[in-house]
Amino acid sequence: MHFQDIITTLNSFWADQGCVLLQPYDTEKGAGTMSPHTVLRAIGPEPWAVAYPEPCRRPTDGRYGDNPNRAQHYFQYQVLIKPSPVGIQETYLASLEALGVCTAEHDIRFVEDNWESPTLGAWGVGWEVWLDGMEVTQFTYFQQCGGLDCSPVPIEITYGIERLAMYLQNVENIWDLSWNNKRSYGDIWLSLEKGQCDFNFESSDPSRLKQLFDLYEAEASDLIAKQLPAPALDFVLKCSHTFNLLEARGVISVTERTATIGRIRSLARGVAEAWLTEREAMGFPLLNNKALPLDQPLQS
């Protein structure tokens, strides 16, 4: 199955489960969790079901395209459903079947691995899902986001698309993956990967990055004070990515790292509180929405 077909198949599968299908969020982030469609929607009592592919950036993971299974830019497929439905593990296994994995014939294990994002003030209990010894998915019941308790508890399912593709295509190098029947993953992303690694490790200006971090932090703080959680989150994400760039340059000491993570986490808490206040003032409108039955088409 081609890389783009994995995304199409997961879109179709999760749409059939009632998920809203969305597109990637338009700023740098280290994980699909950081999209407002997950990190904000996980907060508060309103029901939510969403699925989307998300490009992710982790500057320190770059290897100039020389590593067969590691890159600073990669893709996740993100699912968030709140409240967590009964039988979600079986539904997830059905999604693997939709991708062509006969679950009865393969070794699929749920290996306990609780998840945490210190910068987001988020954590959950869950598992890594291993397919024949390779981790392909993270399965997490969120307990907190932005330092706020999640009630009801959502389920987050995060597929590593490259790893799934390597398994499905029986390929050992991500750059050799077929994107479609004409182009490889490397055709599309390898040149960009090399250039971005140069920036991450050599060409970026650490002093300028530190200035940017301070500016983004100030902007986020001002927006939180104005009770504007959506744009404030954008600048929190910019803080997070800039911090990751500084780490890639090797200019963050252990003490600075702890302090900087604390600064970002404090901002994330402010965004979460502002979001919850905003939704409460609106009367939590999604609590009153009635879903259309799946067997009834929209009426024009």
UniProtKB/Swiss-Prot annotation:
GO cellular component, one term: cytosol
InterPro entries reported for this sequence: aa-tRNA-synth_II/BPL/LPL (IPR045864), Gly-tRNA-synth_heterodimer (IPR006194), Gly-tRNA_ligase_asu (IPR002310)
Keyword Ribonucleoprotein in annotation: no
Parts of the chain that traverse the membrane: none
Keyword Metal-binding: no
Main location: cytoplasm
Record's catalysed reaction(s): tRNA(Gly) + glycine + ATP = glycyl-tRNA(Gly) + AMP + diphosphate
One function term, GO molecular function aspect: glycine-tRNA ligase activity
This protein's UniProt keywords: Aminoacyl-tRNA synthetase, ATP-binding, Cytoplasm, Ligase, Nucleotide-binding, Protein biosynthesis
Listed EC numbers: 6.1.1.14
Record's subcellular location: Cytoplasm
CDD domains tied to this protein: GlyRS_alpha_core
Pfam families documented for this protein: tRNA-synt_2e
Example of a GO biological process term: glycyl-tRNA aminoacylation
UniProt similarity note: Belongs to the class-II aminoacyl-tRNA synthetase family.
Subunit structure comment from the entry: Tetramer of two alpha and two beta subunits.
UniProt-recorded name of the protein: Glycine--tRNA ligase alpha subunit
